[in-house]
Amino acid sequence: SCDTNLNQISPIPSVPVSYTLHILRDAPQLMTPGNSVAITEPNKQGQYIGYGGLLICYGLDDKYYAFDLSCPHEHRRDVRVEVDMIFATCPECGSQFDVGFGSGFCNKGESKYPLKRYTVTRTGDYLRVTQ
């Protein structure tokens, strides 16, 4: 039913997020709008990838977005959304989230919450994801 209440706090716990990648070297697919990359392991010591991992998207609006991979309906570290172009779908509850324009809002399924969103800063060919 997706009654997304935009004022609700995400049930995904706040844990450290600090992750940097080089677009060309680490994720060349992020040079094409509509593409994304899922990060489930830190790439080096001192990198933190949130609760269930990071979903980094290059939106159709030419901006970068990042979300926690954990489904906010299931809120379990091991239940991660799977991405197909501009939608991320939970394999457990079937909720579908819009990631193509960075909202993370649920547009189909049971989740009352959007995906937990993180901040992305681009500097040259580097992307940095923080809380």
What are these regions (language model features)?
Residues S1-C2:
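Sec-dependent bacterial lipoprotein signal peptides
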Residues N5-D84, K116-Q131:
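N-terminal pre-ligand scaffold of iron-sulfur
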Residues H73-G109:
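Surface-exposed, polar helix/loop patches in the mature regions of secreted/periplasmic/lumenal proteins
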